A protein has these predicted regions:
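Long, low-complexity, charge-biased intrinsically disordered regions
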Residues: 1-213
Length: 213
């Protein structure tokens, strides 16, 4: 399945992903349901950041799902057909020996080792990996919203809220934010980072004023 969309900055983004609809008959719902930050939690964070005059930043993790491994013992295949077989073989000629024909069409089967986009369990696998990283860094997951995490640093609360791979972070000290983002980037290289007070987050243009608005 191929998806193409125009982003807000006029860039065109394309993605080839799996067709997860074929999995619904055999993947249990509890293995595919991933938490996402609620609107109420997001609004609460923004109000707290503004009221406490916290420094802020937003960042996203490019190709987030692909950082997560498929569970050990789970076997899944990706069926590549037609012109996409040629593209894959152009990238890695070693795959040419594995190409076969089915009803006159080129077909290449590849074992899936990462949580690729489109698979219905990928969001949960990414969530579990990201939470593990935050816990290792000393964060505590909010008991009321599983996509909000807090950590006390230099006597002040540092908060991260995330919606899949889009994150917003706030702390009184901007250098603390830089340090926390650097630690996350050490795990997931290539973060796209924005520094406050002006942020573009989840389709919203945010501006944190010094007068707590």
């Amino acid at each position: 399945m191929n998806l193409i969309k125009e982003k807000r900055d006029r860039k065109v983004k394309g993605r080839t992903c799996a067709n997860g609809s074929t999995q619904r008959s055999y993947v249990p719902r509890e293995e595919a349901r991933s938490p996402t930050m609620s609107l109420e939690a997001l609004m609460a964070l923004l109000i707290i950041f503004a009221h406490e005059k916290r420094a802020t930043a937003a960042f996203d993790v490019p190709g987030a799902y692909l950082h997560a491994d498929m569970p050990e013992g789970k076997f899944a295949l990706l069926r590549i057909t037609g012109q996409f077989v040629d593209i894959v073989c152009e990238v890695n000629p070693e795959f040419k020996q594995d190409v076969r024909y089915e009803n006159g069409t080129k077909v290449l089967y590849a074992r899936i080792l990462k949580a690729i986009y489109g698979m219905i369990e990928s969001a949960l696998l990414w969530y579990e990996l990201y939470v593990t990283v935050l816990l290792d860094e000393g964060y505590e997951i909010n008991q009321y919203d599983k996509c909000v995490a807090n950590k006390i640093i230099n006597g002040k609360q540092c908060t991260i809220g995330w919606y899949v791979d889009d994150n917003i972070i706030g702390h009184e000290d901007e250098t603390v934010i830089d340090d926390q983002i650097a630690k996350i980037e050490a795990k997931f290289p290539g973060l796209a980072v924005q520094k406050g007070p002006n942020l573009d987050f989840l389709g919203m243009e945010l501006h944190f004023c010094k007068d707590r608005k």
